[in-house]
C-alpha cells in the first residue's frame, strides 16, 4: 500500500510540475519522498530556485506561509491545515501593535517561526542560525524580539550591547529539556558531544558543547571528528543525521522530544494534497509585500 501511495505521489508530482519540501522534523517516510529536506527558510529559498508550479510544504503553517511570501507566483500546498506552531501562536498581533506603541524606539526582529502578519510588522526576520548576527547588524540599540524568549536569551549573550525586549513565547518541545536531562545523558554517554538547539532553556544551553540550528547541527555532525553525539532537538532530525553519517552514533536527549504538529503529515495527506489541490496557502498581497521586505532585510544585513 505504501509503495502504491509513493508511486501515485511521484506520478502526480510530475504531472503537476510540483516539488515536495520536508522539514527536518518530518516523519522518516515523508523525508524520503521529499525533493529537499532542511529547515524552514532553507526550504523556502530553495523553492525560489526551482522551476516548478506547485510547492507541497511538509511542515507547519508558518513555513508554508514563508514559502508563499517568497514564491508569490507558485501554488503552495500545506497537506495538513491543522499543522500549527504553538510558539508562533503565542504572538497576538493586536498586543504586538501595543508593544510597537509602547516601545517606538525599538524595531521588531521576528524569528522566522512567526506568522506572515507578524513578519509584516517586523523590521527584519532572523533564523536560529543567524539571530545574533541580525540583532547586531540592526542599526538600533533596542530591539523587540519575538516570539522565543529562549532564543532571545541566547542572542543577549552574544550581543550584550543591545537592549532586547523579549516576547514571552517558547517552543514546548525544546522547552521540555531540563538541566537534569543533560546531566543524565552525559553520564550515560560520557564520550558524546552534547549539541542543542538555541530554543532550549538557558540552563540547558550552558551545559552544551555546541549550540546550533537544525541545519547547523547537520553541518557540525558532518565536519566533526567526534563519533558520538547527544542531540537536543526534535527527534525527527536524528533520521537525517544517521542517514548522512552512517559511521557516527546519535542519541536523543529525550525520546519524548516529539513535535505533534510536525508528525501530522503523512504520505496519504501528501497524496490528497496533490490530488485535491489542498490546502492552498495564500498571503494577502499587502501583508506579503511587507513580510517579504523583512525577510529580504535579513538577507541584506548578513550579506
UniProtKB/Swiss-Prot annotation:
Residue sites binding [4Fe-4S] cluster per the record: 85, 171, 259
A biological process from GO: 'de novo' NAD biosynthetic process from L-aspartate
One GO molecular-function entry: metal ion binding
This protein's GO CC annotations: cytosol
Pathway assigned in UniProt: Cofactor biosynthesis; NAD(+) biosynthesis; quinolinate from iminoaspartate: step 1/1
InterPro entries: NadA, NadA_sf, Quinolinate_synth_type2
Recorded catalytic activity of this chain's protein: iminosuccinate + dihydroxyacetone phosphate = quinolinate + phosphate + 2 H2O + H(+)
Entry's cofactor comment: Binds 1 [4Fe-4S] cluster per subunit.
Cofactor requirement: [4Fe-4S] cluster
Keywords from the named record: 4Fe-4S, Cytoplasm, Iron, Iron-sulfur, Metal-binding, Pyridine nucleotide biosynthesis, Transferase
Domain of life: Bacteria
The protein's enzyme class: transferase
Subcellular location: Cytoplasm
Pfam families documented for this protein: NadA (PF02445)
Residues bound to iminosuccinate: 23, 40, 111-113, 128, 197-199, 214
E.C. code: 2.5.1.72
HAMAP family named in the record: NadA_type2
Function comment: Catalyzes the condensation of iminoaspartate with dihydroxyacetone phosphate to form quinolinate.
Similarity-based family: Belongs to the quinolinate synthase family. Type 2 subfamily.
Protein name: Quinolinate synthase
Originating species: Thermodesulfovibrio yellowstonii (strain ATCC 51303 / DSM 11347 / YP87)
Encoding gene, per UniProt annotation: nadA
Amino acid at each position: 500500500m505504501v509503495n502504491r501511495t509513493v508511486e501515485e505521489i511521484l506520478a502526480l508530482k510530475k504531472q503537476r510540475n510540483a516539488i515536495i519540501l520536508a522539514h527536518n522534523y518530518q516523519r522518516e517516510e515523508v523525508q524520503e519522498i521529499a525533493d529537499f529536506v532542511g529547515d524552514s527558510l532553507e526550504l523556502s529559498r530553495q523553492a525560489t530556485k526551482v522551476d516548478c508550479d506547485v510547492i507541497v510544504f511538509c511542515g507547519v503553517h508558518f513555513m508554508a506561509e514563508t514559502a508563499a511570501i517568497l514564491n508569490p507566483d507558485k501554488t503552495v500546498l500545506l497537506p495538513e491545515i491543522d499543522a500549527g506552531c504553538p510558539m508562533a501562536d503565542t504572538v497576538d498581533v493586536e498586543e504586538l501593535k501595543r508593544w510597537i506603541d509602547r516601545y517606538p524606539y525599538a524595531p521588531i526582529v521576528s524569528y522566522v517561526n512567526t506568522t506572515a502578519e507578524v513578519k509584516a510588522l517586523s523590521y527584519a526576520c532572523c533564523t536560529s542560525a543567524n539571530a545574533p548576527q541580525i540583532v547586531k547588524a540592526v542599526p538600533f540599540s533596542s530591539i523587540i524580539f519575538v516570539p522565543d524568549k529562549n532564543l532571545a536569551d541566547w542572542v543577549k549573550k552574544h550581543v550584550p550591547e543591545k537592549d532586547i525586549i523579549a516576547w514571552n513565547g517558547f517552543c514546548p518541545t525544546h522547552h521540555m529539556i531540563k538541566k537534569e536531562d543533560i546531566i543524565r545523558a552525559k553520564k550515560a554517554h560520557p564520550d558524546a558531544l552534547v549539541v542543542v538547539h538555541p530554543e532550549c532553556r538557558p540552563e540547558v544551553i550552558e551545559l552544551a558543547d555546541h549550540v546550533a540550528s537544525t541545519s547547523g547541527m547537520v553541518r557540525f555532525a558532518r565536519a566533526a571528528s567526534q563519533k558520538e553525539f547527544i542531540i537536543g532537538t526534535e527527534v525527527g532530525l536524528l533520521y537525517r543525521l544517521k542517514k548522512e553519517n552512517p559511521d557516527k552514533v546519535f542519541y536523543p536527549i529525550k525520546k519524548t522530544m516529539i513535535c505533534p504538529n510536525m508528525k501530522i503529515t503523512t504520505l496519504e495527506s501528501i497524496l490528497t494534497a496533490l490530488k485535491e489541490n489542498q490546502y492552498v496557502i495564500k498571503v494577502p498581497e499587502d501583508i506579503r509585500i511587507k513580510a517579504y521586505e523583512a525577510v529580504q532585510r535579513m538577507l541584506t544585513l548578513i550579506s
